[in-house]
C-alpha cells in the first residue's frame, strides 16, 4: 500500500488570508468562531439572524466578536465578524452593524462572567417548545428523565 499523498494543510492556507495587522491568536479564534456559525447553520439552529455566538478576544477582557447583523450564519466569515467592546463601542472599524438585542445579552454575560470565553444563544425548535411549557421539562418520560438533575 502506497502512502497517501500529502494533503494541503487547511489552517496554513487560512493563515495566509490573515490581515497583516491582526494578531495570529485572534485570527485563529475568528476562524473557529466562523466555523461554529457554519455548524449551527448546518444543524438548523439559526432562526434567521436572531441568534448569536460570541467569543471573547484574548488579551482584551472587555472585547468580544459577534456576527454582523443581517448576514445569515452561512455568510459569517473570520473577516466579517465584528469586534465590539462591552460598552457597545466598536473596537475596530466595521462595515456591518451589530444586532442590538444580541449585543445586550452577550455583553451582560461577558461582563459578568470573565470565565465565559464563548457564549452561544439559540432558539432551537425543541428548546423553544420546552420554554413555552408552563412546567418546563417534566421528567416523566424516558427521554426527558435523562436530563434530571442537569
Regions inferred by a protein language model and the residue ranges of each:
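Glycine-rich flexible loops
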Residues: 2-150
Amino acid at each position: 500500500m502506497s502512502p497517501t499523498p500529502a494533503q494541503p494543510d487547511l489552517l496554513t492556507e487560512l493563515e495566509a488570508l490573515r490581515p497583516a495587522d491582526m494578531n495570529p491568536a485572534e485570527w485563529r479564534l475568528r476562524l473557529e468562531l466562523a466555523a461554529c456559525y457554519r455548524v449551527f447553520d448546518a444543524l438548523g439552529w439559526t432562526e434567521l439572524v436572531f441568534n448569536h455566538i460570541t467569543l471573547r478576544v484574548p488579551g482584551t477582557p472587555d472585547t468580544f466578536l459577534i456576527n454582523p447583523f443581517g448576514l445569515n450564519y452561512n455568510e459569517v466569515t473570520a473577516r466579517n465578524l465584528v469586534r465590539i467592546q462591552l460598552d457597545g463601542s466598536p473596537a475596530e472599524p466595521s462595515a456591518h452593524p451589530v444586532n442590538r438585542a444580541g449585543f445586550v445579552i452577550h455583553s451582560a454575560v461577558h461582563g459578568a462572567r470573565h470565565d465565559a470565553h464563548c457564549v452561544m444563544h439559540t432558539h432551537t425548535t425543541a428548546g423553544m417548545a420546552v420554554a413555552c411549557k408552563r412546567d418546563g421539562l417534566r421528567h416523566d418520560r424516558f427521554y426527558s428523565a435523562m436530563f434530571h438533575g442537569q
